[in-house]
Regions:
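Macromolecular interaction modules
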Residues: 1-170
């Protein structure tokens, strides 16, 4: 299963501090039983949530785990979260989040139904099954940044800002 959290903050003067906090947050999240990987991205496309984190999880039971409940959330950042961009969705359709290297981009397209092709790219379609369910389906694709095609304005382009972290990461 895939858990995707999208957000942004209202005080952009604190963006560097937010970025540092998020690195530690991801490190903690991959210590939760049932979370095997986490990676954070920032939007290169205006009009979309500025920050996206993608997690590989074993099941929705992760969200009721006592340890998860003790470490989840935004902590001191909660009052600064821009609610226009705050979305948490749980998806089925993929066991592990795709790896996006530094020179790749994560493409995200929310749709009512899966589509065969968008921009000539092969998409993985995820079905929303829990939490906010802000979209029925989310298409994701990882492409080389150098080969990024022209895309519709309804497709978000995200660049990785952390490596994919896992229980085996340093």
């Amino acid at each position: 299963m895939i858990f995707i959290s999208q957000s942004g903050i209202t005080d952009h003067t604190r963006e560097a501090q937010w970025d540092q906090w998020y690195i530690e947050h991801l490190r903690i999240m991959v210590t939760v039983p049932g979370i095997s990987s986490a990676q954070r991205f920032k939007a290169d496309t205006p009009g979309f949530p500025p920050s996206l984190a993608i997690y590989s999880i074993t099941s929705p039971a992760v969200f009721t785990d006592p340890y998860y409940l003790s470490v989840r959330g935004m902590g001191e950042w909660l009052p600064l979260i821009d609610r226009r961009h705050y979305r948490r969705n749980l998806f089925e359709g993929l066991e592990h989040a795709p790896l996006a290297a530094d020179d790749a981009r994560l493409l995200v397209a929310d749709r009512l139904q899966p589509q065969d092709a968008i921009g000539g790219i092969e998409w993985i379609w995820l079905k929303s099954v829990g939490l906010d369910c802000s979209t029925p389906y989310r298409g994701i694709a990882v492409v080389a940044a150098a080969k990024l095609p022209a895309l519709a304005e309804t497709v978000a382009v995200y660049r990785p800002v952390t490596p994919r972290m896992s229980k085996d990461s340093d």
